[in-house]
Amino acid sequence: MISVSNVSMRYGAKILFDEVSTGFTPGKRYGLTGPNGAGKSTFMKLLTGELDPQKGTVVRPRKLGVLSQDQFAFDKYRVIDAVIMGNRRLWAALEEREIIYAKHEMTDADGMRLGELEGIVGEEDGYTAETDAAILLQGLDIPDEMHERKMSELPGGQKMRVLLAQALFGHPQALLLDEPTNHLDLDSIHWLKNFLNQYEGVLIVISHDRHFLNGICTHIADI
């Protein structure tokens, strides 16, 4: 669950939110609507933790799937790795494991730590991570031959599809998606609808595509 308690936010003299309290429940799919400038994206950033409220609190689950809006942030990584990075706990374990394996000599402490890391990788389905990531990429029309390329080699529209796959990866407890259908063709939108309609966590979506929202949302919140 995501819980918002007595949250207030203003920019200069403009009050965006005043003592807002609400909750978002697992199994429900929420669409945020409202005119440009109403504060939808700001509210989403408060939910993700990208912004802190000036007053009040937001309580969120540990595993969040958030659609990044920075298409250059992962340019040095392979496409498949950028998706797997959506599960931060798994990615941190994989990186640390690789560092230990690269050592010329391992200590007893390294061996013990490797055992802990293998446990994390197993808990987070790390042994099927590349397969799971590839399925998401295929659903969003990123062909197999692009999965090993660097993100920097992709055009902007395809980068945003990869970042959407990143948000969906790793069984997040909550999905927070700001305009997820941007850069998607009709087949990919249809695939995304099916995916989200089967998702069992908390889903919060901002979209100007009311037809898309009507196809996935159980609740609409107007800001």
Please report, for each region that a protein language model flagged, where it lies by residue:
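ABC ATP-binding cassette signature C-motif
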Residues: 1-223
